[in-house]
């Protein structure tokens, strides 16, 4: 067929389909809405997946960015490690891995690697106390190298980015704001350039605002500001000894390959330089048998970050909404098939007038594709609403911005167009196939009623199959939702080992406003005393971090009865009266006393990372039941000593002595069994206070803030919430999945019921004469 004729007949088909759909406006509206809901649900989930998993970083030529990762059979002799890069890291157990490296190794790569046009590094995020811009507030900062922005090719929206000269210990303190932070906290004022603010008490000049599109190298993570790595000792003293320490890994390294340089060549060069770095110092950082190696991996899409949290639930939701689309196609296909049966005489007339089967197939598929197009357009609007609703749910589970987006880009538009086309073909095949098999003589000879009656019997087999498919898919969706809801209920019913009711949590960190460790301890004790005097307060204590917050850590000990064997344990520094406040049970020994905190302070190094004082007493600790069962074989641990797992070259520690045994308490997760846990006195650090009340804890929030303000006016209160809310955030992923699955299951049920109702209505309509005769008889 000539192109002109094909275009002409296609236009005719579209016009006829449009007139037909307008004549059957009610049925068309229901069909389009059904399809729009299904397509909208799929597009909403896909748009979020697109922003998190599929998009390249908003940097210049992201395909040339590479990130370094290390792996080994045994953990190297790194005596200090931090997983600040948001990468997937495993420091303990067999086959450890990570993406953090030492500052000296970064400098060596930056200055001597010929395969890269530029090499940058970063660490963070750090909580920074921002003063000098109204009321003091907490911001999330990232430590970056001076060439960070130039390596990524990220320009400044205002002012200038950081430069290599800024990353120098003797350089003035400077910072670059993120675009969102500039708008929110500085009202988008251009006068911010050159403004001096305090960061943890360090006067810092704002020199620029980052591009609007850039937030970090980790999709889903948002940082408020960026400061040079060289400022880290001034902002946080604990970073100081790490600057020139080859055994301290804390920086993530990214490099931009030179044009024309292959990854294999760059890998070989990095291997050589990494091998040289391992031999630096008095003792090698690994043995040949440890197989410590470095690997270059593409950083085109960024680091793992939020992907670890959201990939699985998004994949589950994508499968669920895919089932919704199948139900909708079966639903509409059944209705379209029923309409095709009632149009048998029309199809017969078309054939009699010379219309070929191909022409009829085109006409019927055009009608279906027109419906699918309308459904896809409406689905885009529904997807925007759905994506906003999901993002709002996710945002409510976090104390800081998630950075997730559901923006529509070309990939999302192509996805919507694709599933609309596939849907139109899926639900259009059955009626098109039926229309092509019209019996010309019988359809023209009989009246429409008889034709429909016979067509009904031919329709039953395929129509029933579509109905069964809808019901089956609906049942699968309902069962899946039921299992997810049941999982959430089971997790919520888990006993955490302490009373989670009526506990108010908030965090303070006096080091952010210049307090030294001794002064920090005094302020923490003063706050504990003043908070305990508030009305309706029945207990107050503190810990380095809240239980079940998902952010607690651990360490490795060496026990006298297991020499040379590392014994892993959770580790939580706490204050006096901690177990009484939580209503946990002390099973043996005693609780911490003020003298224990004095002993712990005496064994603390006077210089961060340095050796402990000579002849320091052992630090008193309390262990849980799981620790006793696993490492003491049920024997009494009271009075027993143990120490950190010793790595040659590290300073000796004075060790620990067990003074008590406490009942098992869930630590980081409600899913996992209680692991060995060690509690020590909290010394010289920011802490999370736990305030138990006899009434609603939220009613005490204002009084707590006022007490903190009166005690130290410059001390910000961070992340105030109840213990129940903290656990709720821990279960956020399970809760969101259960809620969305429940909604999708109800939607599947509604679509299936609507489809069955339509099919039954058509069935009854075609049997009106038969029913009338039966009633007359």
Specify the residue positions occupied by each region the protein language model found:
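N-terminal membrane-entry
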Residues: 306-323, 410-415, 731-748
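"Rare, low-scoring activations can occur
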Residues: 207-218, 233-308, 526-540, 618, ...
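A short glycine-centered flexible hinge/capping loop motif at secondary-structure junctions
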Residues: 38-40, 352-356, 375, 379, ...
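Hydrophobic alpha-helical transmembrane segments that constitute the membrane-spanning cores
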Residues: 46, 370-391, 478, 751
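Structured, solvent-exposed hinge/loop segments at the ends of secondary-structure elements
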Residues: 42-193, 198-205, 246-250, 263-293, ...
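Alpha-helical transmembrane segments of integral membrane proteins
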Residues: 1-28, 299-306, 335-362, 366, ...
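Short, strongly hydrophobic transmembrane alpha-helices
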Residues: 24-52, 56-58, 328-330, 372-376, ...
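Interfacial "coupling" helices/loops that link adjacent transmembrane helices in transporter permeases
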Residues: 328-372, 755-777
